């Protein structure tokens, strides 16, 4: 066959392309164009099966190459199926309300001009830091508006050509215009204490004094003072209130306010006893005519005699025992603490109405020698000190000489072993607890001690030591 001389041919050229070749070339050109505009890998309906061919999941068509699938996507069948799928999804989807767009209300106000300002250059004396102080005047600022500021770079503004060497500080407050200050483009130190100011006022510590009211006529009460923080004023404190004792102890009783009775001055007063402690009782022992050795274990007492305090009288006639509620200690109570001196031997309670004599007036019993002054032997536990050479008498038994007159009428002598109580308002002498004989309760209210028989009356100081009969022989 002569391929060189066919009609329509050109010498030196190839043969005329057939129709199949022309179609293949066209499809290749379309595929290249489609790949430039469409990414086939992102198509949700494109799928490559296990045989190496391509499928369209929307139209369920099979394609041998990518160009065939791209030509299908541009065809009528694929486009119709896309429109049908979109309508079906729109119908099945629930009607959802469109999200409301947040509308920012533009503030509308009439600008009244630029505010006044003052700029001051400063330098820290310690650190050497440079700073700028901006003082902006906003005398007519809107109610509830606080001035705001921000830093703007040179590339954000549209007023001047951008220059990277400068930045702008903007200050805004309605209804004034926003103003800007051109400052060097350096880093701002925004540390605490370096950037902001705070101005504050202290509250008034004392309220203003109320106007003084004129003094009214006598007998008219003035209105009460105003309340302080809703609380009434505190009452005035007494002038002579003693300070509270240390250690949480109760306050001692107040001293009597009446005039002190006249009497001979005495030694300084001893401190009042602790609450619930009885005063020391004067132990009365009859003087003896002979000298007897002291009982074993008995220590001689101290020669120092503490008379009653100045201005304290003995109990008057008809004085009752102490107030109810005060019980004497039980038998066997220990003697007073160290530092408390027991009564001297031979000291008798004075008669009613007679002031106590000075210390050392009563003569000692014959043959009794007091110990050396300044010697204070410690009392032993449970043993009362006795005079040297004096036997402790039997409890509640005091022998009397025959012919001794009974006490005057109206005078209640104290029972043996019963401690006399001072009149009300008078504090006892030294603190200390003395044992009471069993069976005697002077604290029972309303009970008077029975008068002592004439033969058992305590000897009087006027009797003298020579008139004392010898003690009866012991059993």
Swiss-Prot record:
Pro residues bias locations: 208-285, 293-306, 314-380, 448-475
Gene3D superfamilies: 2.60.40.2690
Alphabetically ordered keywords of this record: Acetylation, Metal-binding, mRNA processing, mRNA splicing, Nucleus, Phosphoprotein, Repeat, Spliceosome, Zinc, Zinc-finger
InterPro entries: Matrin/U1-C_Znf_C2H2 (IPR000690), Matrin/U1-like-C_Znf_C2H2 (IPR003604), SF3A2 (IPR052092), SF3A2_dom (IPR031781), Znf_C2H2_sf (IPR036236), Znf_C2H2_type (IPR013087)
Molecular-function GO term, any one: zinc ion binding
Keyword Aminoacyl-tRNA synthetase in annotation: no
Matrin-type zinc-finger residues: 54-84
Residues bearing the modification Phosphoserine: 153
UniProt KW Repressor keyword: no
Chain segments carrying region Disordered: 1-27, 208-475
Subcellular location: Nucleus
Family matches, as SMART domains: CactinC_cactus, ZnF_U1
N-acetylmethionine carried by residues: 1
GO cellular component: nucleus; U2 snRNP; U2-type precatalytic spliceosome
GO biological process: mRNA splicing, via spliceosome; RNA splicing, via transesterification reactions; U2-type prespliceosome assembly
Tissue distribution: Found in all tissues examined.
Residues annotated with N6-acetyllysine modification: 10
Family note: Belongs to the SF3A2 family.
SUBUNIT field: Component of the 17S U2 SnRNP complex, a ribonucleoprotein complex that contains small nuclear RNA (snRNA) U2 and a number of specific proteins. Part of the SF3A subcomplex of the 17S U2 SnRNP complex which is composed of three subunits; SF3A3/SAP61, SF3A2/SAP62 and SF3A1/SAP114. SF3A associates with the splicing factor SF3B and a 12S RNA unit to form the mature 17S U2 small nuclear ribonucleoprotein complex (17S U2 snRNP). Identified in the spliceosome 'E' complex, a precursor of the spliceosome 'A' complex. Identified in the spliceosome 'A' and 'B' complexes.
Role played: Component of the 17S U2 SnRNP complex of the spliceosome, a large ribonucleoprotein complex that removes introns from transcribed pre-mRNAs. The 17S U2 SnRNP complex (1) directly participates in early spliceosome assembly and (2) mediates recognition of the intron branch site during pre-mRNA splicing by promoting the selection of the pre-mRNA branch-site adenosine, the nucleophile for the first step of splicing.
PANTHER family xrefs: SPLICING FACTOR 3A SUBUNIT 2
Identification of the protein by name: Splicing factor 3A subunit 2
């Amino acid at each position: 066959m002569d391929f060189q001389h066919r009609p329509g041919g050109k010498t030196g050229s190839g043969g005329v392309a057939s129709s199949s070749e022309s179609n293949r070339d066209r499809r290749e050109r379309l595929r290249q164009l489609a790949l430039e505009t469409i990414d086939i890998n992102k198509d949700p309906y494109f799928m490559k099966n296990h045989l190496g061919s391509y499928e369209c999941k929307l139209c369920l068509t099979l394609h041998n190459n990518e160009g065939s699938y791209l030509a299908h996507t541009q065809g009528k069948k694929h486009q119709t199926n896309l429109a049908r799928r979109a309508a079906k999804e729109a119908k099945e989807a629930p009607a959802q309300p469109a999200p409301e767009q947040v509308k920012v209300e533009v503030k509308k106000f009439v600008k009244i001009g630029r505010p006044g300002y003052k700029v001051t250059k400063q330098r820290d004396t310690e650190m050497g830091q440079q700073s700028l102080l901006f003082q902006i005047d906003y005398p007519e600022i809107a109610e509830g508006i606080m001035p705001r500021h921000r830093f703007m770079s040179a590339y954000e503004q549209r007023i001047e050509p951008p220059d990277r060497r400068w930045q702008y500080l903007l200050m805004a407050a309605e209804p004034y215009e926003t103003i800007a200050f051109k400052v060097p483009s350096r880093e701002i130190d925004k540390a605490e204490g370096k950037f902001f100011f705070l101005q504050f006022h202290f509250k008034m510590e004392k309220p203003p004094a109320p106007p003084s009211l004129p003094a009214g006529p006598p007998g008219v009460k003035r209105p009460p003072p105003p309340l302080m923080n809703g609380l009434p004023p505190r009452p005035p404190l007494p002038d002579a209130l003693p300070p509270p004792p240390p250690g949480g102890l109760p306050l001692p009783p107040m001293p009597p306010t009446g005039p002190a009775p006249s009497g001979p001055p005495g030694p300084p007063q001893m401190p009042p006893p602790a609450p619930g402690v009885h005063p020391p009782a004067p132990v009365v022992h009859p003087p003896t005519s002979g000298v007897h050795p002291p009982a074993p274990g008995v220590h001689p007492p101290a020669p120092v005699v503490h008379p009653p305090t100045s201005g304290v009288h003995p109990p008057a006639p008809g004085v009752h025992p102490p107030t109810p509620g005060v019980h004497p200690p039980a038998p066997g109570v220990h003697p007073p603490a160290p530092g408390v001196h027991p009564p001297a031997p031979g000291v008798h309670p004075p008669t009613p109405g007679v002031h106590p004599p000075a210390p050392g007036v009563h003569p000692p019993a014959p043959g009794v020698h007091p110990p050396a002054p300044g010697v204070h032997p410690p009392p032993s536990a449970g043993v009362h000190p006795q005079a040297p050479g004096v036997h402790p008498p039997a409890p509640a038994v005091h022998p009397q000489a025959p012919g001794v007159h009974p006490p005057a009428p109206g005078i209640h002598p104290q029972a043996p072993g019963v401690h006399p109580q001072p009149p009300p308002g008078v504090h006892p002498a030294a603190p200390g607890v003395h044992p009471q004989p069993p069976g005697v309760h002077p604290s029972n209210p309303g009970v008077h001690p029975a008068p002592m028989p004439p033969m058992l009356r305590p000897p009087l100081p006027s009797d003298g030591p020579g008139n004392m009969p010898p003690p009866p022989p012991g059993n």
